[in-house]
Amino acid sequence: MSKFKYTEFEKQMNSVLTHQDEALADIHFPSSDETDATIAKAEALLRSLGYKPELLKELASFHQLKKIMVVPTWKELCAEAERHVGTHCELESIFTEEELRSNELAIHQLNEEFNVVHRLDAFDISIAALAALVGAAVDILLVGIPNKTSGGLKGGPLANYIRDYFDKKFPEEEMQKLANSKVSKVPYDAQDNRHTTIRVEGLSAYYHRLLQLGHDPLLGFIFGVADILTGRMTTIDKAGNIVSQVMENYADRKESDIFAALAKQVIHFKSDVTTSMGLPAPLMSLFNLLQFGNIGEEEQTIAEIVQGMYYEGYDFIHFCSMSIPAMIVEVIVRLGYAIKRIKEGHAVKDSIPLSLNREKHPKLATMLFIAHAGATAANAGKVYFTQNPVAINYPQWIAFAKYSYGQLKWVLLEKPTLRDAYVRGKINEELDAVLAEANASFDMFAEDYIVVFN
């Protein structure tokens, strides 16, 4: 039984090929040596009788009449083949064992040709490893872990530099004036439950920005703007409850125009970004929904762990600091990839590593996956040895998740499909050459016939 599953057309093709193969095998072809010897004897006899064979050939061509050749339809070919060999023919049957092994070897070589294009060499792996090591070193030595001190939040040298930059860019006095002005007041900015109609667990001056979706740097542009337009406050409280309520006491903070609401949202972000309990990291508010887990000696849930991280200084500015190691990994890999491509002789415009399209840049996505996997593993070690969840590099884990998904999709779905297309393309190129040769042979053969197609 064949290991292949054939379509109806392929079954018909197999029957026709099997029948034609058997028909050719039944034809007795005299050896070319015998034929040449017979022709030579006939020409010698003609010359002995005073004839010139060359002239007889020219004479014969003048008197030769063209025969009629009828080409059957595909349906007729199939019917004839099925009468002789049936409908359950296997394509492998018309090949010898040696030919089948040769075919398998050819397919294996084509697969290997495709794999070589996407396989990383020592330089590719070295670039990815270097990026991972540099990113991990920056994360451990320069970003560090935020700690509350008498002088404010302090971390590694790089984290302190980023926080100082934000403080200089958004001076405390100016931000205080902005926060007290009407242009920055929003209806969702309640700091406790005094003005709420539905109690929000954990709502306080310390945690209100973590609980209110309007303060999320990403979700705020959806929920925050919507709350400004409707005069509401949308929260996910400490217990994981989603609450959306009208804030009657803050009705004067509403806006009726979406562009005015968007502008107010941006201004409010600006006024809050450098406060002692600043904006949370992007999407951090959603972790309040994760009311499960039994982590550490205190047996905390994931939501409680994240709430504690925010309290310890895991805010938007620290998120920006943590983004730098992940960015460094990206830059080193992409720059190294581009330099290597240029040295290999590729054009500069074809070496610019902006796209992750594997047909244009076969190895780039895999190199980025390896580099981010290494940097993420180092961060996991940092968290393990410090036993401090604030050491988690959130942007690095996001990058790792992104490239892991892409790599998994590539290995399981895209790579087999592209490899099959590559192999089929090569086979079709050879088939086109064979068909062109067959058509040329048929045209030459048909010169002496009147061809009729049914």
Q: How would you name each of these model-derived features?
A:
Residues 2-454:
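Glycine-rich, hydrophobic membrane-spanning regions of integral membrane proteins that mediate transport
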